[in-house]
Structures are given as structure tokens and as C-alpha cells.
Amino acid sequence: MDIGIFIPIGNNGWLISSNAPQYMPTFELNKQIVQKAEGYGFDFALSMIKLRGFGGKTQFWEHNLESFTLMAGLAAVTSRIQLFATVATLTIPPAIAARMASTIDSISNGRFGINLVTGWQKPEYEQMGLWPGDEFFHTRYEYLAEYAQVLRDLWATGSSDFKGEHFSMQDCRVSPRPQADMKLICAGQSEAGMAFSAQYADYNFCFGKGVNTPTAFAPTAQKLLEANEKTGRNVTSCVLFMIIADDTDEAARARWEHIKDGADEEAIAWLSEKGSADKSAGSNLRQMADPTSAVNINMGTLVGSWATVARMLDEVASVPGTQGVMLTFDDFVKGVEDFGEKIQPLMTSRKHIAQLKEVV
């Protein structure tokens, strides 16, 4: 099973809590995290894009780096790990995104790919005059399909004459083309999102569900397999989990409860309010805004000792259609170290990493 890391491009990572580590995003922090991840055999690193935060006393996600430029910098200081940047498709034309990706492909020597997002948080785009109107909530995957087709055309042939409702290319050219097959990611869980991923993406990211319920996402993975049957493609699932691990189950649980006790209720309320504006929202957004565990936007959470977390991650690997997991931590630097030293060696699904190290 592949292991990736969802790097903290925004302040405080993925914890909306005053009891979690409070920090600003910097290149140096993310370089340290990704270089450590590469050293421990992580397969990929992905950065999101966020253009406006949730406010509250923790100013959650009010401070963010930009995804493509961050990953370009990380490409220059890594050598093996795959890197994915996120493009907010309302902000960057596909031909420009294609050229930016080709540039980072050159920097990374073929280790780059793109995560495509349509945008669900209206204030991010409204502040720049880029919000196309609330009807976009209903047409965004048609828009994204055209965007992806232009990217595929330009990377495959170096030119595009695509004509659609949203984009019109006239002998549009991009050269040099990427040296490696450029992978696309989407994070759809709605019916429309799944259909898009099955048609255009190489991987589909989905949320894990609940606390210590590692296989609860299985119905989502199954829906993607069913969508694949309609397109004849083999698009696999990568699942998002937060790891809260310690020497004992009790110590890990105490840390998780302490984080929840410091929840920034104002920021969480803002997330719920803005998320409700999207009446067509798929389960991803509904899950993020659910009050049950909104302190970490309701991503799946694995809490326990090193052995307990290793066992649960192996359970994730057993779900049909699962390519890998993407991990977040309360403390990213220590979390990556603890994963590499104390969790990964106990995982059956990562035995190949130990074997590779023995060969080296």
C-alpha cells in the first residue's frame, strides 16, 4: 500500500483547536517534513490550495502558501518522492496549468502530478471577482471535465483545438511536454465526482470515516470500482487519515481528547455555514462540516499505540480498490518520524520498504 503525506500548507495543519500545535506554514517546515517522509519511504506528498480561511481565535487557514510554487521548491530538494500540487481551476486557465506542470516535471525529473479542485468555498473566489455564480455548484464537474481534457490534450500532443462550453483552444501549444506520464487526482465522493474521476483521474482521494474505524470508507471505494466499470479504466482510491499515536492506546486517546477540548467553535461554525451554501454538495463537504469531529474536518482518525495504528492501517490496505493512504499528524515533524520508526516497521502492507532498505 502506498503512503503519502498531506503537507501543512496552511497554518495549524488540519486541527481546528487551540490545544493543537499553533504554527505558520513555511517552506522550511514543509521541506523538513517532505525530506523526512522521503527518507522513510513515503510514496508521495500532496499540498492543497486554500485562498481564505475560517477565522476564529486560531485564525484557522487564514495563512497559506501557494501550492504550485511550494511544490516546485520541494521538487528541487527531493529526489524520489512523487509530488502533487493542487490547482484551483477557477483561478488558473488549463493551458497555463499545463505549462506550470511541465516546468515542475522538469525540475523533479518526472515526479509531478496535479490535484484538480473545482472550489466549494465561495468567499475564496468572490474576494477576487472570480466566482461565476451559485449555478456553478451544479455545473462544476462539466467545467472540470473540459479543463481536464485540455490538460490531457496538451500533455499528450503539445497542442489543443478543444472547443467546449467553458474553454475554447485555437492551436494552443505547450512545449516541452512532460517527460513522465502526468497523473491527475480528484477528490470526488458524490455521484458526479465519482463519474469524473473514473473518466479523467488516475487516483481518487476520499475521506476516511470515524475514529478507529479504518474500513468504514469501503462503500466509497466500491462506488469508484462501479464507476470504473462504466469507463473501462482502473482508477484507485487513496484515503485520508489523521494519525494520533503514542506509546500506549491510553496516552494517544488522552492527547486526542485534549485536542478536541480546545476546538475553535467559531471557526468550525464558519465551516458549517459556508459549506451549507453548496446545496449540491457531495458527501466530502457534508462530512467536513459535520459537528461530530469537526475539530479535524472529520477526516478519518486513527488513535492508538504504534501497534494499534499499524494494525488499523493494514486493515485499510485490505479494502478492495485501495491504492494507499494520505496521512496528516498533529505534529507533522514528530509524526513522520514516529511513523517511519515505530509504525511502518509493524505494517504488513509496508514490508517492501524494509526489504528495500536492506538492499540499499
Swiss-Prot record:
InterPro entries, sorted: Luciferase-like_dom (IPR011251), Luciferase-like_sf (IPR036661), Pyrimidine_monooxygenase_RutA (IPR019914), SsuD_RutA_monooxygenase (IPR050172)
EC number: 1.14.99.46
Domain of life: Bacteria
Catalytic activity: uracil + FMNH2 + NADH + O2 = (Z)-3-ureidoacrylate + FMN + NAD(+) + H2O + H(+); thymine + FMNH2 + NADH + O2 = (Z)-2-methylureidoacrylate + FMN + NAD(+) + H2O + H(+)
Pfam families reported in the protein's UniProt record: Bac_luciferase
UniProt keywords, alphabetically: Flavoprotein, FMN, Monooxygenase, NADP, Oxidoreductase
Membership in a protein family: Belongs to the NtaA/SnaA/DszA monooxygenase family. RutA subfamily.
UniProt-listed NCBIfam families: RutA
Protein's name in the database: Pyrimidine monooxygenase RutA
Source organism of the structure: Pseudomonas syringae pv. syringae (strain B728a)
Gene of this entry: rutA
